[in-house]
Structures are given as structure tokens and as C-alpha cells.
Amino acid sequence: MKNSIISYPRIGANRELKFAIEKYFKNQSSKEELLKSAKDLRIRHWQEIQKAGIDFIPSNDFSLYDNVLDAAVLFNIVHTKYKNLNLDALDEYFAQSRGYQGENGDVTALAMKKWFNTNYHYLVPECDNADIIALTGDKIFKEYLEAKELGIESKPVLIGIFTLFKLIAFKDEKTQKLAKEKLLNAYIELFDKLNELKVTWLELDEPYLVYDLSKEDIALFEEFYQELLNHKKDLKILLQSYFGDLRDIYPKLLESKFDALGLDFIEGKQSLALIQKYGFAKDKILFAGLINGKNIYANDYAKSLKLIKELQKYTQNIVLNTSCSLLHVPYSTEFESKLDSSYLKLFAFAKEKLQELKDLKEILNSSEENPLFRANQELFKNIPERLDEKVKARLKALKKEDFTRTPSFKERALIQKEFLKLPLLPTTTIGSFPQSADVRSNRLAFKQEKISAQNYTEFNQQKIKECIQIQEEIGLDVLVHGEFERNDMVEYFGENLKGFLFTQNGWVQSYGTRCVKPPVIWGDVSRTKPITLAWSKFAQSLSQKIVKGMLTGPVTILNWSFPREDISLKESTEQIALAIRDEVLDLENAGIKIIQIDEAALREKLPLRKSDWHSEYLDWAIPAFNLVHSGVKAKTQIHTHMCYSEFSDILKEIDAMDADVISFEASRSNLSLLDTLKAIRFKTEVGPGVYDIHSPRVPSVEELSLTIEKILNKLPKEQIWINPDCGLKTRAYEEVIASLKNLVTATQKIREQL
């Protein structure tokens, strides 16, 4: 019995990659220094994986920004606008990820989307010229040879041709048609080069196969691989899937020329049933994904061994594997000195998951009952308390009317118009303002008890004053307090709710250099005291203008945390919803007229198969949001915000959330959402996001005016809000002020024309 992992976190044990790249972005280090830091990290990771006794060690899973972009660059799928900048390869790569504004030109970044049902974001490759598609990159070969120098025969990992092709945004059908042929030839050339290097195994990741596949999808997949696998020669090919099962194509895969199939037995609801029904091919190896790559709880070896024993009825050729890449979990629990050992023993981050794979291999390769098995089973005895009877009773007492807001949206809109007295095209921001080093160090000093609560509060109040003043000088209509007290929109609420646990170093990559530290939902959730009330009241006291109350919604808190596995996601979300509802009512009672409840991650846990959307997710996720705000008065305006996702196919459900205003992250996708909003007669007022905050470039007044005009061509002027597409926390003040001034100027210019 051997073991394997799909891929490993690339940010480093202490986010070394993030800091090295950011240093380069700030011109504080050279290209050579950045590339050396990256290589050092790769070497460290390989040695760690090797030391842990993993047989199939991945290479090419490392990335300076995003592995989808890496695959696109490998095959020269680069839009002409980036080529025309005439930058060197590394800076062209970063121009695609972040945009570019400088002496060589001014271009926006590639669109960013959620990676399937995770909180990782990938960059959408753009192809306007298929003629140039060819194997021009060498990253995959270089990194294989780097590992080889360490004495490691690695398994290069690459996104498969079918998934990559499906993720590319093509200029038109003609470009797409030519790209299909060119990309196939490029992958064939890749196979040839890997054969020349005498590579043993290549892992091709095809997560797109876990979606509902059409006949056309299956035909395209077969067309690609029937040709491609004829060129594999001595190269062994592992087809790796994750985030679901392969029910639409599994029987065909058994007859294919793949040497191994990687199946997900954590999220793949039908993976085992498919094997029980169709068996497994004698000429193939099964890479069994039984270590959860997306959650941080320790593996129960009894359950894993039971699964392996069942699989062994159908094949003896089994490799123990992770269910998906380990980049979705933190690096290691060894940096957690503050968490009580009674909790910590039940957690397994990436490094500990390597140990679990090693243990399981050893247990399966030994004949008698192994002490490793007994030690694992002991972990699950005497678990700390998770239940709260008061929370259970409150959930039980919920009635149907608790999930419905009255009066109707139409009636509320008239009442709010009279009450709020906002101009046409009201301007606002999404919530957070830049968090400079002094804001972060003030928060850290307070956490480490180096300063008093009074000092901490006074510092933040001064920052709020400055933030309100900046917004008033710029001329925004609805203000925010800036969220200087918050490290992260989810972690902050988790820290102030009962039922959550927190790590010191549990960082996970969200996109590029952005890392998040998800809380752990351990027990039943409740609010013991107001969370944001004092900050909101203070901010509102500073201005005659409306200052929004800012909260994170229950679905986002759930989706951006590591969830419990002992109760349903529905129950966990409803518990959080009741806690946030208490906060909403406190804000309203304090005179806060607009309350924003962000559901940035609503789409994130949407099942990948459409048939499961309602029964497994939307039927409880939307009501959970309704539960949060159903108790407010008609004159209180409820806002929500969503980002990084495609929403066009669930807009009716979003409308059913019954918020009064919703802001979307739509600027990176060229406002394509607007046509759907218009088509379905979306009732909620909308702020589509007029510029991309993930890029350091400052949009001009002309550019913003054109964007606003584009929105006005699609939606009634009474329905539109003008705002950036996301929070401003990660940007510098000079970019923010310049961008917002241009936003207000453009809006005023358009108002005059109306």
C-alpha cells in the first residue's frame, strides 16, 4: 500500500511566500531574490513531504499567484493586451494577476472566480488569439528537475486539458475552435518532453468532471483524451478528480487508457456506490481520496480502514490519497501554542495530514492491530463540550413568520425613500478602509495585552474620525466607519461569539498573496454581548450623514470557517443567524438607519450539481439570511454584499433574500451580470461595483462615467447605487482617495445629465 497527496500549501509555514511577493511588488527586493525565496520554499516543502513518508510527491503544485494562470502561461494563453505591455515574463504574469498601470500601459487584471466550491479564487485565462497557443513555458519541467536534484522522483501536477479549456474565456467561437486544436497539440508536446525527461507519473487534475456533464462535455473530454493518451508512451497518467464524484463519466473512464483514477471519497457522495455498481479496472490504480483536504478535523482511522476494506473487494491496486489539494487547510498545528490540547489533538492541518497518510499506510501494511490505530481511536474519547441547551431551545421555538420580513419590498422602498432622503445614484463604499501597519500593530498590542482597552479604543476612534472626515471631504452619500477593529470580516465575529475556536497561525491562501485565518466552529453558537454596537454608535455621532452598520451574514461566517462535522450545516447556520439577528436589532434600536449584512460567500457552498442546489443548500441558506433581518422596521434599510462569484443563475434566489439593496463584485466580469438582472426584473436595488479594488490601478473619471452609463443602459436609475466592487482594506490610502474622488466626480457628472 502506497500513499500520495494531490498538492501542498505553497504559502509556507509562516506565509513566507506572501511576504516575499509583496516585497517585490513594493520594489523592496529583486526578481532574483523573489525567485530564490520561492525555490527555497519548494525545497523545504518537498523535503517535509519526503520525510513524512509520502510515496507520490507532487511537483508543479507551487505557484507565485495561481495555478490556473500558471497552466495558461505554460501554453501561452495570454491576452494581447498583456503581451502589448512588453514586460518580461514575470511582470507580465503579475500584470495578468493584478493589472498594470505604468509607463508601458494601463490594463486591468484578469477576472477572478471562486475555485469550484472553495474559498480559493483562480484567475480566468483570456484568449483573444488562439494562433499563439503552444508549449512555451518551462515551469513544470524546471520544478520536476529541482525535485530530482534532491533525489525525489516527483509526480508533476497540472490542470487537465478538459478543465483548462472549460475555464478559459474565449473571444469568440472561431477562437475557441482553433484553441481546441492548438491546446491539444501543446499537451501532446508536453507529454513528449516529459517522456524525454523520463518522468514516471503525470497527474492531470480534472475537477470539471464532477459537475453535471452534458453530452457535449463528455464528447469533448473523450475527443481530447482519446488523442492525448495515444501519445503517453512510457508516461503514466493519473486522472485526478476532487470536490465530488464522477457519476456522469465513470463507466467510460474504466475503459480508457488512463493508468490511474483519483476519486474523492469525502465529497464524492456516489464514489463508493459507482465502484460497487461498475467495479474497478484491473489495469488501473485507484488513488483513494480519504483524507479530507478541506477540513481540519483529525481523520478517524476506523472509518478510513472500513472504506479501504470495502474498496479492496474490487481492487488491490490502491494508493491512499487526499480528497483534494491541501492548500485549503493551514500548514501545521505545531505553531498553535494557545489552543488547549484537548482541542488541538483533534485537528490535522496539512503537515499532520501527511502523518495520517503515513499512519494509515503503516497500519494497512502491518498484520496485527497497530498501536497507531489505538492511539488514533483514543483521540475521540473525552471530547470537550459542544452543546448549549439554550441555543437548541431557541432554534426549536422558531416559527415560519421568523423567516419573513414585512411589509413587502415595494412598500418598504417608498417608506425608506421618504425616511432616508438619499439622492439619485447614491454613492457609498462596501465597508472596510485601508488597514495600515499602525492599525494592525495596535490590534496586536491589544491582543497581547501590551496596551489597555481604553488605549485600543481611543486609537480606533481616532481612525474612525479620520475615515469619516475623508469620506465627507470626498462627498460620499452613505458612509462607513472603516472596520479598524476587525482583522477579518469572519474571524472578528467568531471571536465575539460563543462556540468558536481560533488559531494563531492557521493561514489559508484565498487568492494571490491574500491569506485568511478561518475560525473553527466547535460548539453551539450564541451571542453573549453586543459586538459592533459601540463602534457604530460612535461613528454615527460624528456625521450628519448616514453611517452604515456593518455585519457579516451567517452563511458567509459558516462558509469561511471550518465547520462542525457532528451537526448539519443548516443547524450551524441557523444558530449563527440568531446571534447576528440580535446584533441587527441592537443596531436598529441605537438609531442606525442602514445595516449591511454581508453575504460575500453565499455561492461558495452551492453544490456543484444543479439538481442539489435547492435541497442541499439554498432551501436553508436563503431563509437563514431572512431570519437575520426579518425583525427590523420597514424604514430600516438592509444592505448585503456579494463578491468573487458568478450569480446570474441564482439571482431569483438572491432576490428572495429580501434585502433592500445589494452590491455585487461585478467589475472584473465586465458587468455581464446586468443583462440577467434586467431579464429577470430583479427587484432589489443594486450597486454592481464600478471598479476593481483587487488591483492597485486608479480608474479615471472617464472610465467610471462610461461604467455608470453602461449600468444606466441596463437598469432603472432609481434602482442603482454607485460603489467600488469590494472592501478597501487591502489598498493604500492614496489609491483609495484618488479612486473614490473620481467615483464621486463621475457620479455627479452623470446626475447632472439625468
Swiss-Prot record:
User: What is this protein's gene name?
Assistant: metE
Reactions accelerated catalytically: 5-methyltetrahydropteroyltri-L-glutamate + L-homocysteine = tetrahydropteroyltri-L-glutamate + L-methionine
GO terms in the biological process aspect are: methionine biosynthetic process; methylation
Q: Which domain of life is it from?
A: Bacteria
Report the pathway entry: Amino-acid biosynthesis; L-methionine biosynthesis via de novo pathway; L-methionine from L-homocysteine (MetE route): step 1/1
| InterPro entries linked to this entry | Cbl-indep_Met_Synth_N, Cobalamin-indep_Met_synthase, Met_Synth_C/arc, UROD/MetE-like_sf
Q: Which cofactor does it need?
A: Zn(2+)
So what EC number does this one have? Answer: 2.1.1.14
Q: Which UniProt keywords apply?
A: Amino-acid biosynthesis, Metal-binding, Methionine biosynthesis, Methyltransferase, Repeat, Transferase, Zinc
List the active-site residues: H694 (proton donor)
Q: What does this protein do?
A: Catalyzes the transfer of a methyl group from 5-methyltetrahydrofolate to homocysteine resulting in methionine formation.
**Residue positions binding L-methionine:** I430, G431, S432, E483, D598
From the UniProt record, which GO molecular function terms apply?
A: 5-methyltetrahydropteroyltriglutamate-homocysteine S-methyltransferase activity; zinc ion binding
Q: Which CDD domains match?
A: CIMS_C_terminal_like, CIMS_N_terminal_like
Positions of Zn(2+) binding: H641, C643, E665, C726
This protein is called 5-methyltetrahydropteroyltriglutamate--homocysteine methyltransferase
**Which residues are recorded as binding 5-methyltetrahydropteroyltri-L-glutamate?**
R15, E16, L17, K18, K114, R514, C515, W560, E604
Q: Which PANTHER family match?
A: 5-METHYLTETRAHYDROPTEROYLTRIGLUTAMATE--HOMOCYSTEINE METHYLTRANSFERASE
Spell out the family assignment given in the record's similarity comment. Answer: Belongs to the vitamin-B12 independent methionine synthase family.
Residue positions binding L-homocysteine: I430, G431, S432, E483, D598
Quote the cofactor binding remark: Binds 1 zinc ion per subunit.
